[in-house]
């Protein structure tokens, strides 16, 4: 095919169209024995902001890897505009521990590296060569026109705005190996922002962002002229896009024009139509099964060879159609809670019959006593520095938490929110945190369930089922094989998942394990640290509903504005000392 190169079973083509930037059709993509995609279509036009959503495990990260060129083991066609400048967030950083952050970011900026190399090297060898002198002059002019003379300073500003640098930290000395996984994700976002490419591909960009950083990102989204394709479940981000592509469990895609609110309305109508189609096919299956039986009986009763052949042909035709219909997977029906409330009784009952399985969260719902569970009185915490000195992390914090109350800790990344939770609830690392001022009073008999940002190390190297069993044993709770199977079912894990190492599971699957850990036992106080980061939209809704039903106390950290608005918490702001 002219202008195309074959990559395994994938075809990459280039097109001269001006508005079309990317047009992909994937007819087969598998992960192990599981077929993830069979009819996937993704397109992005010039300047368009498009989001990809879907259930955990549907294959969104795999699709991102395919579209960004990190995975070429698929069947299908990907067409890009000729000369397209594309930048994508990297999912892994193997072998880059010593890489300096600023050069790493600038390496992702089209033209910068080439022009910088020309400006640095041409003076050393051009002499009186007019061609090289002209090349050098053009490089200088282009470098200036692109604003590259002050780009390092601009990147440093972004590093500070996104909370990766503070105080007297030198940007020129910052290395990737010094950063957490969440901070590396922010580096990728900064790389995309400064790349000024035609098309930016971003995978869950706002995970681990604080509210100030997220607002900066959303502002950039609105103002930027470049096209974007974003894998996300962040409803604040989904509100800013112009189209949403849903990757379904059956390996197909549906495209919705508009932002999140418009997507929800269209999804309600699409789901109703899909349920009609599903019911029609179920009726057709029932009819075909009866026809097969009828043709068999008529064939047996007949004595005419021609009539027997006719019934045999009709039976084979019915069996072929039946086999085709029975191979079709049941669609994953989901309608958001507000739209469900708008359904008439008949449609609501039908949706209740056919809706997709969602996680089932059992929370403590016995009316509490409203007693005071936790008191923070002018608390100031600190960590010992290399010099031995202990500097305060934040200004004094005071708060009270009663049973039945919901409290949100707010503040920038690095302000000390997670550190405060660690100290208050004696989590891993609490011994390294010093109480410099004030007092912390937690009722000793209160049963606390914690949702960690990271899974505790002792469970990561165990198969999922064993990790659940170990978790219950470590907490002195009764556990049985039946209970393990029940939990796996309630949290949407498959039989294949149960023997997978926890460390090898997806972000969404790990998040569901964290929910199991938080709710193990009859908890009176739930502590959640960024719980919506890796959950899909239906799971986030179920978590919100479960927390709204919970009659104990809730203390959480989240930069998900929709999540916080639904829970309507009281708030405590953590102000960093430095």
Where is each model-derived feature located?
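A short, proline-enriched helix->beta-strand linker immediately N-terminal to the Walker B motif
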Residues: 194-198, 517-526
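ABC ATPase nucleotide-binding domain signature region
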Residues: 49, 62-141, 242, 249-250, ...
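Flexible loop/N-cap segments at domain edges
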Residues: 340-450, 454
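Walker B catalytic motif
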Residues: 175, 204-205, 528-531, 535-539, ...
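ABC-family P-loop ATPase nucleotide-binding domains
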Residues: 94-178, 279-282, 452-517, 521-523
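Coupling and communication elements adjacent to P-loop NTPase active sites across diverse families
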Residues: 14, 19-31, 111-185, 266-389, ...
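Hydrophobic anchor residue at the start of the ABC signature
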Residues: 188-189, 217, 515, 543
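Pre-Walker A (P-loop) beta-loop-beta motif of ABC nucleotide-binding domains
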Residues: 40-51, 83-85, 225-226, 397-408, ...
């Amino acid at each position: 095919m002219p202008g195309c190169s074959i990559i395994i079973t994938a075809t990459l083509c280039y097109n001269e169209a001006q508005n079309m930037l990317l047009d992909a059709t994937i007819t087969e993509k598998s992960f192990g024995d599981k077929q993830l995609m069979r009819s996937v279509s993704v397109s992005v036009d010039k300047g368009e902001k498009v989001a990809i959503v879907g259930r955990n495990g549907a294959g969104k990260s795999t699709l991102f890897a395919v579209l960004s060129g990190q995975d070429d083991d698929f069947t299908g066609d990907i067409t890009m505009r000729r000369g397209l400048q594309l930048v994508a967030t990297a999912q892994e950083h193997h072998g880059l521990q010593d890489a300096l952050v600023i050069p790493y970011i600038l390496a992702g900026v089209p033209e910068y590296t080439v022009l910088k190399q020309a400006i640095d090297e041409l003076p050393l060898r051009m002499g009186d060569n007019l061609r090289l002198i002209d090349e050098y002059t053009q490089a200088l002019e282009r470098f200036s026109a692109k604003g590259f003379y002050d780009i390092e300073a601009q990147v440093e500003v972004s590093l500070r705005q996104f909370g990766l640098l503070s105080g007297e930290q030198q940007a020129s000395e910052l290395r990737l190996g010094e950063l957490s996984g969440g901070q590396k994700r922010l580096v990728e976002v900064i790389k995309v922002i400064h790349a000024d490419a035609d098309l930016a591909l971003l995978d869950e960009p706002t995970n681990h962002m604080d509210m100030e950083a997220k607002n900066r990102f959303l502002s950039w989204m609105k103002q930027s002229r470049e096209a974007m394709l974003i894998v996300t479940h962040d409803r604040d981000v989904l509100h800013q896009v112009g189209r949403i592509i849903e990757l379904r469990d059956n390996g197909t895609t549906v495209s919705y024009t508009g932002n999140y609110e418009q997507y929800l309305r269209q999804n309600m109508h699409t789901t109703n139509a899909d349920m009609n189609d599903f019911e029609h096919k179920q009726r057709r299956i029932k009819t075909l099964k009866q026809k097969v039986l009828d043709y068999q009986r008529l064939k047996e009763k007949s004595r005419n060879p021609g009539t027997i052949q006719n019934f045999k042909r009709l039976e084979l035709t019915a069996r072929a159609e039946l086999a085709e219909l029975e191979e079709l997977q049941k669609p994953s029906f989901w309608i958001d809670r507000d739209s469900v409330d708008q359904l008439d009784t008949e449609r609501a009952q039908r949706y209740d019959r056919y809706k997709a399985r969602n996680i089932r969260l059992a929370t403590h719902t016995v009316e509490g006593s409203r007693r005071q569970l936790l008191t923070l009185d002018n608390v100031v915490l600190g960590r010992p520095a290399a010099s031995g000195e202990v500097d305060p992390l934040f200004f004094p914090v005071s708060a009270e938490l009663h049973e039945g109350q919901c409290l949100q800790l707010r503040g920038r990344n690095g302000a000390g929110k997670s550190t405060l939770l660690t100290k208050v609830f004696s989590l891993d690392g609490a011994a390294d945190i010093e109480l410099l001022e004030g007092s912390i009073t937690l009722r000793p008999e209160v049963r606390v369930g914690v949702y960690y940002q990271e899974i505790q190390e002792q469970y990561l190297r165990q198969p999922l089922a064993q990790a659940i069993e170990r978790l219950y044993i470590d907490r002195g709770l009764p556990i049985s094989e039946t209970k393990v199977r029940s939990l796996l079912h309630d949290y949407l894990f498959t039989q294949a998942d149960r023997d997978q190492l926890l460390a090898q599971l997806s972000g969404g699957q790990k998040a569901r394990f964290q929910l199991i850990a938080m709710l193990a036992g009859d908890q009176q106080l739930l502590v959640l640290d960024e719980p919506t980061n890796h959950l899909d939209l239906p799971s986030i809704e179920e978590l919100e509903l479960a927390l709204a039903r919970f009659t104990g106390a809730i203390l959480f950290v989240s930069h998900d504005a929709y999540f916080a608005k639904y829970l309507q918490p009281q708030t405590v702001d953590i102000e960093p000392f430095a």
